[in-house]
């Protein structure tokens, strides 16, 4: 029995001791506020974006120096849950995916990240001119921010966030929302 326990602990030790935070999975919950900035609609939308995001371990290390700084690429998959606080619709639920390009500073406690990607979603469309026009929509986003570890496996995130929603030309006219704002959140590494 002791030998079996020793083998289990020896095999689990490398899994528990990731050399670098980017080599582990990360689950984040972020929310914020965005305002309409485009001319795709006459409606001054305001949106509360909330995302539950899963980041994969590092897929690609572009660069690494002797002090521990790294430039890496991870996968990012998000469940988008948005409250439309100003506009004819009231919610948006979607899925999105993107690469997460991250610069990790020496010491592996702080990183800057950038993602640009897209996906699909559903909203409660109305017949209001300038509104989404149909329930099924496409999304794309850009997210630039910073992550700071505040405790073992726990980090704070904050950044600038841009999101676009439209129906991809499936209706005429093709209304869209371009919204820019900020997000803040909490991340858990496992």
Regions found by a protein language model. Name each.
Residues 18-24, 58-73, 104-111, 150-154:
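Short loop/turn motifs that connect adjacent beta-strands in outer-membrane beta-barrel proteins
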Residues 25-35, 75-81, 114-120, 158-162:
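Transmembrane beta-barrel strands of outer-membrane/channel proteins
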Residues 1-22:
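Cleavable N-terminal export/targeting peptides
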């Amino acid at each position: 029995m002791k030998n079996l326990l020793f083998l289990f602990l020896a095999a689990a030790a490398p899994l528990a001791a990731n050399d670098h935070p980017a080599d582990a999975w990360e689950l984040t919950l972020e929310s914020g506020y965005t305002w309409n900035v485009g001319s795709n609609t006459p409606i001054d939308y305001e949106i509360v974006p909330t995302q539950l995001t899963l980041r994969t371990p590092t897929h690609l290390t572009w660069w690494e120096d002797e002090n521990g700084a790294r430039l890496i690429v991870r996968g990012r998959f998000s469940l988008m849950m948005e409250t439309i606080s100003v506009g004819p619709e009231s919610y948006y639920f979607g899925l999105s995916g993107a690469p997460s390009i991250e610069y990790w500073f020496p010491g592996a406690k702080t990183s800057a990240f950038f993602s640009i990607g897209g996906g699909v979603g559903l909203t409660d469309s109305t017949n209001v001119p300038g509104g989404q026009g149909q329930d099924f929509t496409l999304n794309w986003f850009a997210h630039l921010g910073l992550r700071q570890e505040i405790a073992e496996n726990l980090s704070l995130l904050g950044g600038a966030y841009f999101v676009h929603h439209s129906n991809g030309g499936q209706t005429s006219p093709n209304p869209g929302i371009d919204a820019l704002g900020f997000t803040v959140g909490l991340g858990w590494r496992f």
